[in-house]
């Protein structure tokens, strides 16, 4: 019904994204976690508002270390050139009429230096913070609560 507010997330050609985990299970977890996070933020939309998001690229924080692939995958975070990035298109409708739309390029260059409210075991903690800031800047909506942590097989390793 048109009174229902919600977020619809579509991942366009995820196999072509700049940086995703190597394992297909982890890739699925990441996409599901991103979708769930956008849906949580969408709870702040006004009644009758629908937000359609098409994610066209994801570059996760850190870099996969291909030398350490095996039982334990490693994602190295050095904070130099490996900050999280995402590209998306969005369309906000009010009762079926488009009231805002655009393309957005999200990034957080100082992701390692900043306070982060998400759990340190959440594989998407840096991406969620970046999305929160974009959502607040674009729609004036702050997150209510936290989406559940996304757990992947990758171990984050911080290198200075």
Which residue stretches match the model-derived regions?
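Short secondary-structure boundary motifs at beta->alpha junctions and helix caps
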Residues: 16-17, 24, 101-133
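C-terminal/domain-edge helix-coil "capping" segments
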Residues: 36-38, 116-160
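A mature extracytoplasmic/lumenal domain signature
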Residues: 13-15, 55-59, 94, 104-110
């Amino acid at each position: 019904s048109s009174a229902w507010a919600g977020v619809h997330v579509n991942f366009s050609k995820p196999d072509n994204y700049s940086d995703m985990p190597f394992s297909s299970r982890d890739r699925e977890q990441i996409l599901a976690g991103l979708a769930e996070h956008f849906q949580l933020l969408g709870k702040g939309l006004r009644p009758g508002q629908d937000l359609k998001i098409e994610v066209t690229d994801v570059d996760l924080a850190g870099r996969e270390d291909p030398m350490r692939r095996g039982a334990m995958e490693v994602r190295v975070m050095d904070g130099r050139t490996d900050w999280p990035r995402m590209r998306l298109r969005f369309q906000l409708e009010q009762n079926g009429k488009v009231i805002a739309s655009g393309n957005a390029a999200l990034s957080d260059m100082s992701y390692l230096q900043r306070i982060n409210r998400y759990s340190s075991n959440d594989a998407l903690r840096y991406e969620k913070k970046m999305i929160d800031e974009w959502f607040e800047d674009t729609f004036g909506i702050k997150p209510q609560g936290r989406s559940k942590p996304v757990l992947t097989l990758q171990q984050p390793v911080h290198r200075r």
